């Protein structure tokens, strides 16, 4: 089955906000095994909305529309859809009472324009909004479905699975199939390299759809299998997963919704190890990512941003002679930072970063993007030298935090043991 997507709003066309709804809907349709052949955005203009609907329904069996269901004058979607198909609007008194009840419950001021949120085209099937005031609706137009939802992401993400998907399955029962999917998250490898490593597996020849989705600093490899039965789809996917892991195990850091910091946190917690972090060029980004994980206080003892040479000396014990001879961005300094923060925090592990994020500060010997990452465990101190060839300061910081967490994950996954 083919599903078109139409997002409506002047704020989308002018670039004032990012269209998160379209990507969410497309992803959910893919999970259901339905294809999205077209995605359009138009402004809050009735003629533009009608033209877009006609065009999309010429290519798709159904269209999911978002936006323009609010109470203000520029919210024109309901009226535009009704006029496009020669339908009259009616006011649903039950919905109106519910909306008024929400305003009264929270003490909101009621403006006359709020009434229009209870207006719907005749013959529409209403789609309840459990978290807001803008209800959606669907219409069957000559065997094709138009489903209209509010543009507020939090409301849309409740109403699509609870309201729209059941209607689609009921209206197009033959289109319901089994879809099995797995997302691998990789780092430190390009799309071309992944494609080359998977070439001999011939996954597509086995009925597996292979998709590459760069999302800096990671690359997502998505494997999808569509079959008549769940058992058949899962069997083919399981075999494809094994082949992908065999070829890409070193670059894979997580699956599906798991994050790199989440994977690191799970390993630290499982092994009952503690960590202290000293950051220079990353400015606290590693610690920030780790503390996004609930319960991180179990393993994260402290994080120190030692940006200046004085901080490296006073807090971490890096000798001035080392800084003078090798510089702040060097392997000896990174090693001593990791050892120093481990000693300071009395932890099992110490992780440190130092580098030149740019756009200034680079030299011929140490160009922009030069980074050293060290990991100390009391037995040995590992150090890696990286050169991130981007002029963007933020990208260098993010890439460094990613490499540091990946270094830590590999250490933990290998079963290495710190000195107790």
From Swiss-Prot:
Q: List the disulfide bonds.
A: none
Pfam families annotated for this entry? Answer: CinA, CinA_KH, MoCF_biosynth
InterPro entries given for it? CinA, CinA-like_C, CinA_C, CinA_KH, Competence-induced_CinA, MoaB/Mog-like_dom_sf, MoaB/Mog_dom
Q: Which Gene3D superfamilies match?
A: 3.30.70.2860, CinA-like, MoaB/Mog-like domain
Q: What family does the database annotate?
A: Belongs to the CinA family.
State what protein this is by name: CinA-like protein
Species annotation: Syntrophus aciditrophicus (strain SB)
From the broadest rank down, the organism's phylogenetic lineage runs: Bacteria, Pseudomonadati, Thermodesulfobacteriota, Syntrophia, Syntrophales
């Amino acid at each position: 089955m083919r599903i078109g997507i139409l997002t409506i709003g002047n704020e989308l066309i002018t670039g004032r906000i990012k269209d998160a709804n379209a990507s969410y809907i497309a992803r959910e349709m893919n999970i259901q095994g339905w294809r999205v052949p077209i995605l359009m955005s138009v402004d809050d203009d009735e003629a533009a909305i009608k033209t877009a609907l006609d065009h999309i329904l010429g290519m798709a069996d159904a269209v999911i529309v978002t936006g323009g269901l609010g109470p203000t004058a520029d919210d024109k979607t309901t009226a535009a859809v009704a006029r496009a198909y020669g339908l009259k609007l009616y006011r649903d008194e039950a919905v109106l009472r519910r909306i008024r009840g929400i305003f009264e419950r929270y003490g909101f001021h009621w403006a006359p324009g709020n009434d229009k949120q209870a207006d719907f085209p005749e013959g529409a099937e209403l789609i309840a909004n459990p978290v807001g005031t803008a209800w959606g609706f669907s219409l069957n137009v000559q065997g094709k479905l138009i489903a209209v939802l509010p543009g507020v992401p939090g409301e849309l993400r409740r109403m699509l699975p609870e309201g729209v998907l059941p209607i689609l399955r009921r209206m197009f029962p033959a289109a319901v199939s089994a879809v099995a999917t797995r997302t691998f998250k990789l780092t430190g490898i390009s799309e071309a390299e992944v494609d080359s490593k998977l070439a001999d597996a011939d996954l597509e020849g086995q009925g597996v759809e292979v998709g590459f989705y760069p999302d800096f600093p990671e690359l997502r490899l998505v494997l999808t299998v569509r079959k008549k039965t769940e058992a058949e789809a899962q069997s083919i996917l399981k075999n494809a997963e094994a082949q992908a892991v065999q070829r890409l195990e070193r670059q894979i850091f997580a699956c599906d919704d798991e994050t790199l910091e989440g994977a690191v946190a799970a390993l630290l917690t499982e092994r009952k190890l503690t960590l202290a972090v000293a950051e220079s060029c990353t400015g606290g980004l590693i610690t920030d990512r780790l503390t996004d994980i609930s319960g991180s206080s179990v393993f994260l003892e402290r994080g120190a941003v030692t940006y200046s040479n004085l901080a490296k000396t006073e807090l971490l014990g890096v000798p001035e002679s080392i800084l003078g001879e090798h510089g702040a961005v060097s392997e000896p300094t990174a090693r001593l930072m990791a050892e120093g923060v481990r000693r300071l925090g009395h932890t099992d592990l110490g992780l440190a970063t130092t580098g030149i994020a740019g756009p200034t500060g680079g030299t011929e010997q140490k160009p922009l993007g030069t980074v050293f990452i060290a990991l100390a465990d009391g037995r040995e101190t590992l150090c890696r030298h990286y050169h991130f060839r981007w002029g963007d300061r933020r990208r260098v910081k993010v890439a460094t935090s990613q490499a540091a967490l990946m270094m830590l994950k590999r250490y933990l996954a290998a079963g290495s043991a710190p000195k107790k």
